[in-house]
Amino acid sequence: MGIHHLFKKGRPVISFEIFPPKQTSTIDTIYDTLDGLYDLKPDFISVTYSAGGKGASDHVTCDIASIIQNKYHITPLAHLTCVNSTKEEILQNLKRLQENQIENILALRGDIRPDVEPKHDFEHASDL
């Protein structure tokens, strides 16, 4: 379901935002968090790309959004950042999201990492 439909229901919309686990953790660590959030019955859960552009690899946001949608039956909102991605990487991420039937995407510029030269295919989220 498109998240915009939730705001037409005439009631407050409840959502949560989660961060993918760092590289030192496995995706399994997210289940405890999702189990607790499920009990609160949110309308949707957004999944960040990763704080500061560090941490999880690019597929983890999609993997978690897919788990939210298919295991917990909650609408996911996947973040998609562009400042540290090439056009090809963005297209791969969009294809992965589409293959997993993730309909809601929040386009963001993302954080510039001081230790990584930014890629210049997309300077701003509006370029996506």
Cite the ranges covered by each PLM segment.
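Alpha-helix-loop-beta-strand connector modules within alpha/beta enzyme cores
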Residues: G55-H79, E123-L128
